Curated annotation (Swiss-Prot):
The gene is ribA. The active site is at 126 (proton acceptor), 128 (nucleophile). GTP binds at residues 49-53, 70, 92-94, 114, 149, 154. This is GTP cyclohydrolase-2. Its cofactor is Zn(2+). Belongs to the GTP cyclohydrolase II family. It comes from Shewanella amazonensis (strain ATCC BAA-1098 / SB2B). Catalyzes the conversion of GTP to 2,5-diamino-6-ribosylamino-4(3H)-pyrimidinone 5'-phosphate (DARP), formate and pyrophosphate.
């Protein structure tokens, strides 16, 4: 495996002080990050999340997706629980990159849904891979998880690298009038597990 650990530092956040662990993929040149909180040792399952980079949602507060809401909620839940992890993977735009994501947004502005936009650009609906999580989790000493996700591919990715996923914890947050159609497409076309009550929730302005 081409993933190597680089360094660890403290990361003060509104929810507490996390540890930030840096990893480098020598094959792709991508730099991935793991955030941890509390003591992860022992046999008890660890609350965690696989989160793919989303500059627009995570840093620019975009309402077109639910990514930023999911990241903040995951960090808050982990801090409240007292222990947990987030694997922050550099796979912008479901793996197509930032500029192609903007191109996809342009197509969505013209009426395409998130899957159709990717396909019109010549990409699969979801280009992400998760093989890098195995060495990251091994470095952190994690083997049993409670995974915060609505995406069955992430559950399967954990199981594929030998993780014991004892529970899938739904993470349905951030629905608003700008991303309602996007969330519906993720449920209908990508198999994301979201309750009907989520789609009936009151719109945020």
């Amino acid at each position: 495996m081409s993933i190597k650990y680089v360094a660890t530092s403290k990361l003060p956040t509104p929810w507490g002080v996390f540890a930030m662990h840096g990893f480098e993929d020598s094959e792709t040149g991508k730099e991935h990050v793991a955030l941890t909180f509390g003591d992860l040792s022992g046999d008890a399952p660890v609350l965690g999340r696989i989160h793919s980079e989303c500059l627009t949602g995570d840093a620019l507060f975009s309402l077109r997706c639910d990514c930023g809401f999911q990241l903040q909620t995951a960090m808050q839940r982990i801090a409240e629980t007292g222990r947990g992890f987030i694997l922050y993977l550099r796979q912008e735009g479901r793996g197509i990159g930032l500029l192609n994501k903007i191109r996809a947004y342009e197509l969505q502005d013209k009426g395409a849904n998130t899957v159709e936009a990717n396909e019109q650009l010549g990409f699969a609906a979801d280009m992400r891979k998760y093989d890098m999580i195995a060495p990251m989790l091994a470095h952190l000493g994690i083997s049993r998880v409670k995974l915060m996700t609505n995406n069955p591919r992430k559950v399967n990715a954990m199981k594929d690298v030998g993780m014991d996923v004892v529970e899938r914890v739904p993470l349905q947050v951030g629905k608003n009038r700008y991303n309602e159609a996007y969330l519906k497409t993720k449920s209908d076309k990508l198999g994301h597990m979201m309750s009907e009550e989520h789609f009936k929730a009151q719109h945020q302005d």
